[in-house]
Amino acid sequence: MAKVRVYELAKELNVESKTLLAKLHELGEFVRSASSTIEAPVVRKLREAFPPPPEPAAGNGSAAQPTAKPSAAKSTGKTTEPAADAAAPPAVTTPPSAAPAGATTSAPSDAGGEKIATPPRPVKLPQPPRPAPAVPKPPSGPPRMGNNPFTSPMPRPMPPRPVQRPTGTPGTPGIPRPPLRPGAPGRPTPGAMPPRPAAGRAAPGRGAPIRLPGGLGRAPAPPSAGRPGVGGRGRGAPGGAFGRGPGAKPSRPHKSKKQRRQEFDNLQAPVIGGIQIPRGNGQVVRLPRGASLADFADKIGANPASLVQVAFHLGEMVTATQSVNEETLQLLGAELGYEVQIVSPEDEDRELLESFDIELGTDQGDEAALVPRPPVVTVMGHVDHGKTKLLDAIRNTNVAAREHGGITQHIGAYQVTAQTADGPRQITFIDTPGHEAFTAMRARGAQVTDIAVLVVAADDGVMPQTVEALNHAKAADVPIVVAVNKIDKPGADPVKVRGQLTEYGLVAEEYGGDTMFVDVSALTGQGIDDLLEAILLTADAALDLRANPNQPAQGVAIEAHLDRGRGPVATVLVQRGTLRVGDSIVAGEAFGRVRAMLDEFGQPVEEAGPSRPVQVLGFTSVPDAGDTFLVVPEDRVARQIAERRAARERNAQLAASRRRRTLEDILERMEKGEVAELRLILKGDVSGSVEALEDALLKIDVGDEARIRVIDRGVGAITENNVMLAVASDAIIIGFNVRPEGKARELAEREGVDVRYYSVIYQAIEDVEAALKGLLKPVYEEVQLGTAEVREVFRSSKFGNIAGCLVRSGTITRGAKARVVRDGVVVANDVSIASLRRFKDDVTEVREGFECGVGLGSFNDIRVGDVIETYEMREKPRS
């Protein structure tokens, strides 16, 4: 159905336009004025709200049908007879019970004398593209006026009125049009349309032929079979100056001044109060991160365009499909009476998995399906307190020798066998970095662990990262076992460590607490068995470590990196279920099929049960460290989950990056001047190290004049795309334990891109901080060189006034900047030592305690007792 204007529908429904406008506002539709168009669904609602009035009963059902009235007599000559129209008597109203003439009268003979009998059945005329509904039936919608230039605007269906039949005028018989082709339906043409009823038309009877739309000899067709007759006014057609007769479309009624004023008011620009939106009463609306106004409108059942206008009045320039930040959504919700709640990422992910009938984080089956599993132990502590050495002693390996700088750069997961009185038992160890830059990695390690082993050096005691690791373990609500390491070193004091940790709530068992302290030496192996026993005792006493191995595997990706030959490789920890080769797996935004699994020694593994760390090959991309992984029934489901997660994260980032910029911000930037920006591209061997490096670099603060911007980061070797991006954005590439490819190296040398390589994280931080300080404008400070007191003034025609001085402190240097101070007041500033002499000899400097002659160039206002201070501006190093 085509669009209809409000005033047209009002005429059709026989109501006023303002009544329809009020109803539209009740329905929540924003309509400016009566000339606005409305959509088909809205028209349907209005028709239901304003049903047509009941129609009067008609005899034999014929009065309700508009019959094809005979047209006025037309002259075939060039002259018309307006006098006959003027002399026509008034029309006589025919009773409704009168039978239509078209049903009983046969057509007379045509010009050739051939008689064609009118059959009693109607002949169906060819239908135009959009047929109009019959008048007796409730109209479903007015047809749109065509593009025919010979037709006048169609009249709107009105309640049936008694048929007016004008009296015939003698002497003016209608001259019929010759037929196009006997027996063939005529094509609807402008001249063949049903004529407009007019006064002065003769009633059909003897001697008056019946004018048919398709030509002579055709029976009258029902009006619903063709287009409503609105034919153009032909020659000799009766009517007024514009062909309006009694049956023509009524002219537009004259509007009062009040009505015109109301229409003018409706044409004004809409304001926020004029937008009809469903108002809330404090209802809670839950929206995901990065939701758009269309999502909000769908929740409250409103038009997105209306929300765009409301947001515009609130000072937000957004579109209906643009991701909006949390503050804007809450502001808009408060304006409309709703409480907007942004769904957390955890709830979003849970709802996403529930849509696929996947439940994350629970064991399936009853108690009988649960079996014991090994404890997962995370080793945490301050940097260089011997965590990796301790694990080496437990595993009898040498992992620390392979770490750059002796500092663990990423998480390592291992499973070891501990010999106990009840037999061998498995323990899974997770080694987390202790450097301050790896805070996020320590937090992840605490979240996936069962027991935290806090390593504290007996000689150093409690350090900053020790406290941070302790807080992570407490936040994860896991039991803590303290390993006091390096007890073999001179100056070791385990008792001091116990006393320090008491301040943080860890009271040793020997002091009446519930925390187990074990003195160990990773170097000599002392206390290793006691530490393993303490871990198992804590697990048996405080934890119920059971899981169901007979379900699809679920767990967490501890670490991931990109291998040149094997592709993305992720170190995962299975928490429940069993992971097998060939399973479809999804971890965060990465998905794939498990092609192979390797243990910590590089040996292939066919399946991994609960608490087992393995390396998984087969992901399509590198998952982020800390992403949960799960096995799904098929690859299609894994792909859909990953794509939806990626789209959700992209919308959240778009919403976060959209920042409101005010005039105050612009003025502030103008006052500060151009901000220097150091652009970086980070590439690393594992995703956790790249994340830690980025977090550490972004924490560098050298003031408001310079800042760091990481434009790209990734895992794997430095590629040509990274170099081209650095060229386009004038960035520096930092490779952490990675090197560039052959062509990438050549391209970087050719384009002059600065590529830095690091294997220890704090070296990268120091270099970037130095580079960032180099972007700052230099800061100078004044350094005083010396002072000289004027004892005598000598006047020279060649050099001007010469001050005979005694150097009181420092050194007076020729060419240095100077100022003249008289009685504590500076009388001359920014002058220079133009000449410096000692006993008629030109010298470059005069030290303290010696006399000299000083010339200050053009400044000659020198008096006895003045003090000449020399100084220089030196660049101040950035702290």
UniProtKB/Swiss-Prot annotation:
GO-annotated molecular function: GTP binding; GTPase activity; translation initiation factor activity
List of residues binding GTP: 381-388, 431-435, 485-488
Keyword Ribonucleoprotein: no
Region described as Disordered: 48-261
Region annotation (G2) ranges: 406-410
Domain of life: Bacteria
Biased composition (Pro residues): 119-142, 152-163, 173-197
Coiled coil: none
Ranges of compositional bias, category Gly residues: 228-246
Keyword DNA-binding listed: no
SUPFAM superfamilies on file: Initiation factor IF2/eIF5b, domain 3, P-loop containing nucleoside triphosphate hydrolases, Translation proteins
G5: annotated span: 521-523
Biased composition (Basic residues): 251-260
Assigned GO CC terms: cytosol
Region entry G1, spans: 381-388
Family: Belongs to the TRAFAC class translation factor GTPase superfamily. Classic translation factor GTPase family. IF-2 subfamily.
Entry-linked NCBIfam families: IF-2 (TIGR00487), small_GTP (TIGR00231)
Identification of the protein by name: Translation initiation factor IF-2
Organism: Acidothermus cellulolyticus (strain ATCC 43068 / DSM 8971 / 11B)
Organism taxonomic ancestry: Bacteria, Bacillati, Actinomycetota, Actinomycetes, Acidothermales
